[in-house]
Every structure is written in C-alpha cells, then in structure tokens.
Amino acid sequence: MASHLADVQAKPIPTNTKLFSMLALLNAYVPDSYLIMEECQQILGPPDPIYGGPPFEDRMKPFSDLLRVSGSRVDLVHPDIAMKRLADLNIRRSSVARSCIFLLCGEQAQPNTVRFVKDLLTKREMGQKGKEKFSHLIKDIIKEETFGQALRVLKNASNKFKDKHIFPQTVARLYYVGGSKPNFKKAEIWAKEAIERAQNNSYAADTLGQVYKNHLLKKVKLPYEIKGIAEKAFEAFRDVENKAQRELGRELSEWVGSGNFSDGFNNRGHFGFIQVAKIISGKYRRLHPFKQTLKSEVEDKFEFFEWYLSYSKLDKITVEPDYFWKDVATCYKAYTGEDAADSTSFPALVDCLNHGLFVSKERRAKFSVTEKTQSDLEQIRDELKTDYENNVDDVQVAERYVLSNIILSNKVPDSPQQPLVIELQQILQRFLSTGVHESDPEFYLLVLLLFWPEENPRTGEENDNEELNTPETEEDQLRDQPSEEVSINKDDPGENPEQPPLGLISDPDLEHCVTLMEKTYDNVYGKYLRGRYLLPLFFLGKGRGLSRWIHRSRLDAVVQRHVETESDNDPSEPNPNKTKRKKINHMWKSGDVWELPEIQNMLQPIQIETTQQREEAKVTVDCVGGKNITSRIDDKPIKSPVRFYLGFNIRGPVVFYVGAPLNASE
C-alpha cells in the first residue's frame, strides 16, 4: 500500500485510484452516498468483466478491502476513515470534486449521483447562528487549499448544471463572504444569473438581496451610496417576498400541475427587509431619508414576526438563531420608538408570560426583559378593557381583552372567577351571533377555552351554565324571556352592548368551532407556518374556570428549574448556557417533561377514542357530559401511551401522548 501511494505522486492518477478518491470524497462529506456499479465500470474503462475483463475487486486493488459492494451499489466499508485515505493519496479535494462533476454527471447520469454531487458542493449544515455559509467541502477547500480553487470548483459546477440556480447562488455568496476581499460587483452578476435560471423561485431571488445587504454593511459609507444600495436591497427583498407568497406547499404538487413548491414559507424577504432597514438606521445618525416612508412597512414586518415566532418554531426543539428577534425588535424601535416587549397584540399577549424565561426569544436576544408581574398584567387588562368598552364592535379588541384575563389568571390562579367567566362568555357569544369573527382562528381559540366542558363543582356533572339563566334581577328576568319579547335600544347609553341576553344564544357547538378554527388557520396562517412546529399555547389543567388553562410558560419554568438544579451539581461545565438549552430541549423531545411531579400536578389527564374512520393524525377527546371533540395529536411516544394531556395551538386542540419513561439505553 505504501509503495503504491509513492507511485501515485509520481505518475498520472490510475483509474482505480481516481474512482476510489471519488468514493472517498462522497462518503466523507455526503452520508449514505454511493455509486452504481455501472458508473464505476465506466470510470475504470474497458475491459468490462462481462466481456471477459478481470473482476471489479481485482481491478480495485489495493483498495478492495476498503470497498463494499451491495447489489449494484458501491461505497466504503468505513466512511469515517475516508478522509484519512484521501490525505494518504495526497490528492487535492478540489481535484476530486471536479472529477465528480465531469466524470459522474454526464448526460446519462444517475439522478441519485447528481443529488450526491449537488449536496457535496452546496448543502449547508445548521450551525449555532443559522445555516453555515457553505458546504463542509467548500469550507475545507478554502481552508486547506485556496479561495480560488473553491471558486473554480463551483464555477465548473455552475457551467455543468446550467439548469440549477443553486450553483450561481453559491458562487455569488463566495464572492461576497467567502474571500478576504469581497467582490460585490461579481457577486451581483452571479446572483442575477441565479434569478435568470429560476425566475419564480424566492430562494434564488434572496441571494441578490443578500449581496446588497452585505454591501451596505461592509463597504458603503457615503450618504448617496447608502441611499442607492439600500433602494436596490429593498427592491430585491420585496421581490423575494412576492415570490414567496406565490409558492405552494409540496403537498399540493400532485394537484397543481406546475408551479414553484417549497417545504416551508421563505421568510427571508421579510427578514432581509428588516435587516436592511436596521442597517441604514444605524448609518443615518441624523437625517434619515427613509424613516417615515419605511415606518409602516417595518410595523407590518414586525407584526408578521410577532405571530410567526409566538405561534411556531422551526421544529420541536429548534428555534430561529438568537440574533433573529434582536434584529426585528431593534429595527422596530428604531422606526417607531416603541419597545417590542410593551406590545399588547394578541400574539404578544400569548408570549408575554415567557419574558424572563431562559428559553424566551428575549433572553436569547440578550434583551434585559423581565418577567411580567401581576401588577403589569392587571394594568394591561384594565387598559384593554377600556379599549374594548370604547370599541365594542371590534372583534380583535375584544379578543385581546378576553385573552388578557386568561393570561392574568395564570399569575393569580386562585382568584374568584365565575362572574368574570360569564362576562367573557357573553362577549364571545355576542360576536358568535353576528358572524364578524369568521376569518380569525384566535377567536375560536378563545371560544374553545371559555366554553370547554367542565364539571359542576356541586354535582360533579357538566357545568351547563344553569346559574346564568337563573333570574335574580328585573334585568335578568327580561333576558330570560323569548327573543321576540325583548327590545334592545342600541342607542340608549344605559344599555350595555357588550353583554347581550344570554338566554337568546345557546352554547356554541365546539366540534363545529374546531372545524372552523382549522379552516381559518389554513386561510390566515397555513401558508406561512407550513412545515413548522406549532407551539402549544395552553394546556388543560386541574383548576376551574380560567384557572383550568395552563400557559406553556408555566411548564417551561418547571423544566428550567429542574435543569438548573441538576446543573448546580456540575459547576465544572465549560458552557453552562449551551448545556442548559440542550438539556431543556432533550426533556421536551424525550418526553421527560411529562414525568416531572410539578407538571403532573398541574395538568388534567384526559380520555380519548380512536376509530378506523378518523384521519391518522386525529383522535376524539371524551369530555364531561358525553361530548366528543376531535383533536389532532402531537408526536406519539416510543412506548405505549399511559396517559394523555390536552393542549391548544393556533390551529386547534392537540392531544399529547405520554408514554412510559424511557431508560438510559433508549
């Protein structure tokens, strides 16, 4: 073997060495990659074994022992030693990469092989600050060889695959962030080439915006230059946003013949706009020519990210990079003068109890935002009540007032609530009767929380609101009469318009509300949140009235205390924050969170039914009073479930399957 390696350095590379080097490079950088035997024989050249040539294993000596042949597939026995073998061969990675491009990706190339080569050159892994700038191979070529060699490989690939936008995109990125001296002019040319190849693709369009953004950030200083590049950047990111709006989820590909499809909504147009607005606000210290013209758009983007981050995250344990919310909130304050933490929009109220938690987006952004106190929440509630009383026909104002009471109840769970529950039910019933709520999933979330069946504490039966219909005053007696005998003067200031006659409206059909909530979710948020994990916002607890609804933050606080207690026993930990986040994520992913006694004492187990007729992702929740309500399910546990908990996300009710605890090996 050693003598053969010495020969490699002095002579042209033999075909078997060339083939082995390509297998080694692919296996080292692209897990589970392989080549088809037919491809291998083409690289080795004649004579083929079927025409009397020597067996494949003989032709591949001295590498045969390192190869594995399984059917028609060929790969390495030990991919982990592939890089060492490449180093032993003393063949540059860039040279092998070009061989992969030209020898494996001809006109009759195998589709999987083309995919492996594409991943080799362009697939970026997720790092702590978001996606890496380049694939692992390209980073290694820049580090171990030169920037020029990496550029040459990517240009070769771009010229070879003229129908794929990803390669000119990557060349553009290399020009503006890969070298010691960015070349924004060439980056712009290659970014426009990417757009030309995929004119309706939002991800291809994003690269041009990134070129302008980085140009602003790193090089532009003079006011006229700032203005010119900023205008180009805003135009580019608006183009990204428009194209993202027209892209469809992949699940629709079989129904729609043609179009652009993506696994998730591309938020880079929104976020790129925010970043550019933030950059120029820092460059214009005094006279900011864009401030007033951009304010409305910045507010719109801020509202988008408020609900986007309050209702969802990338997956069950992955959130946006720490800088994400920092850039959004900082830009919002620069253009409006308002703190993001003071917002009282519906998603901001949903999220406000997270303030101060280790896992909150505010803490990750390193903002000094503290936990909301009871006094803070009471003040918010009172302000929203006044706002509602002055705008009784505004359903969104009503929603915020109702929600503020549920949020406050999580701080003061033992306060008297029955009269308050009745008041809030009346508000929702009034809008149910008018139909003005029909485009709003938040409204149905509140209806489900306020009217979810519960037992009457005196009888143990379902609380059917009998006490609401027991007349105690002259006004109550009037309300209990049939509708044709009741006269309401809307112009009479003595009447209270937000409290309609309860006897005229029956409790809502919750099963129908679940259906309507899913429908409105699909209409309002479905496009934007597809492919993301919908966060549970509330869980059904053991209390009564508003106290039944446990905000997700209370579970996170318990998990945080548990992890911090464990960490106190290991003061030698070099990166405590990273370790803490990892442990918190593991508890949610593994299901250990459900085994904590504090959480078990909070949550109310439920009974469910499954039937063959129902969709696989749905079950029926058995409620008191014999009512059955359809719910989706979260991930099932590895082991058989032993109990079930009910949560709510912005799409509707969700059942959490709690399995038996896993042992260490599992």
Q: Regions from the language model: what does each represent?
A:
Residues 1-19, 51-55:
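Amphipathic alpha-helical segments of the small helical/lid subdomains adjacent to P-loop NTPase cores
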Residues 1-5, 45-47, 228:
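Conserved GTPase G-domain substructure that encodes guanine base recognition and part of the catalytic core
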Residues 26-159, 166-169, 175:
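C-terminal leucine-rich, beta-strand-based interaction scaffolds used for sensing/assembly
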Residues 111-631, 641:
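Extended alpha-helical scaffold/coiled-coil
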Residues 632-636:
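Short, surface-exposed secondary-structure edge patches
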Residues 637-643:
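Short coil-to-beta transition motif at edge beta-strands of beta-rich domains
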Residues 647-666:
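OB-fold/S1-family single-stranded nucleic acid-binding modules
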